[in-house]
Amino acid sequence: MKAEAAIVNLYSPGDTLSLHRDVSEECNRPLVSISLGCDAIFTCGLDDERVATLRLRSGDAVLMSGESRYAWHGVPKVLEGSCPDWMADWPGEQYQEWEGWMKGKRINLNVRQMFA
């Protein structure tokens, strides 16, 4: 995989990412999704019978490739209060007015290859 594009999403408790399929782009190339901050519930499935539900923690990465690139997937829940302590207190003294801001946030970074 050659990283050519990235999307950064910011979520708060109560935010969701509805089930969807990535059909607006060529899906034969892998996608890497990295989670930071609060934990989230991630659901992925090709049909009603083959569904996986995972708890994504800060620092987890998901690789979607092959058949999974065409799967329905989404984030029905961000888990409030699950941000690791070291990140919940970030950024610290230099930007003290922002201290604790990440405590209720989840950052998702999606990296993908766009061209052959």
Which residues are covered by each model-predicted region?
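Conserved double-stranded beta-helix
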Residues: 1-41
